[in-house]
C-alpha cells in the first residue's frame, strides 16, 4: 500500500478519539510542536497590534451645544461644503477623518473639543 494523503486521511477518519489523541501527542513529540501554540500566538499578536497603532480614525461622537462652531471646524478639517459638514455633524456619531497620523489626530481632536464637540480616536 502506497503512502499518500488519501490513505492517511482515510486512516484518520477510521481512528477513535483516543487513537487521534495519541497521534497528536506523538506528532508533538516527534516535531517539537504543540497543538495549542497558534491560539496563544494570535492573542499575543492582537495585543501588539493595539500598542503599535500609528494611525487613527477621528470620530465625532456628539456635536454639543455649539453646533455652528463645530460645523466650522469640520469644514476646515475636511474641506467639505457647508451642507455636507452640517449633515456630518447632525449625523453624529460619525467618522470625520480616517487613517490620520497620531499627531494630526490629536490636533483635530483638540480643535473639535475646543469648539464644544465630543471626539474619540479609534
Curated annotation (Swiss-Prot):
Keywords: Ribonucleoprotein, Ribosomal protein
Single Gene Ontology MF annotation: structural constituent of ribosome
One of the GO BP terms on file: translation
Annotated Gene3D superfamilies: 3.30.1390.10, Single helix bin
Superkingdom as given in the UniProt entry: Bacteria
Any one cellular-component term (Gene Ontology): cytosolic large ribosomal subunit
Protein function: Forms part of the ribosomal stalk which helps the ribosome interact with GTP-bound translation factors. Is thus essential for accurate translation.
Stored NCBIfam families: L12
Similarity remark: Belongs to the bacterial ribosomal protein bL12 family.
Protein name: Large ribosomal subunit protein bL12
Gene that specifies this protein: rplL
Amino acid at each position: 500500500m502506497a503512502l499518500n494523503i488519501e490513505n492517511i486521511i482515510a486512516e484518520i477518519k477510521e481512528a477513535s478519539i483516543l487513537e487521534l489523541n495519541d497521534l497528536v501527542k506523538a506528532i508533538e513529540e516527534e516535531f517539537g510542536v504543540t497543538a495549542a501554540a497558534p491560539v496563544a500566538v494570535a492573542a499575543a499578536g492582537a495585543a501588539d497590534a493595539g500598542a503599535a497603532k500609528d494611525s487613527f480614525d477621528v470620530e465625532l461622537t456628539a456635536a454639543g451645544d455649539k453646533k455652528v462652531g463645530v460645523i466650522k471646524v469640520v469644514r476646515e478639517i475636511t474641506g467639505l461644503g457647508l451642507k455636507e459638514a452640517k449633515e456630518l455633524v447632525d449625523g453624529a456619531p460619525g467618522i470625520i477623518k480616517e487613517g490620520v497620523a497620531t499627531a494630526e489626530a490629536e490636533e483635530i481632536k483638540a480643535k473639535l473639543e475646543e469648539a464644544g464637540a465630543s471626539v474619540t480616536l479609534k
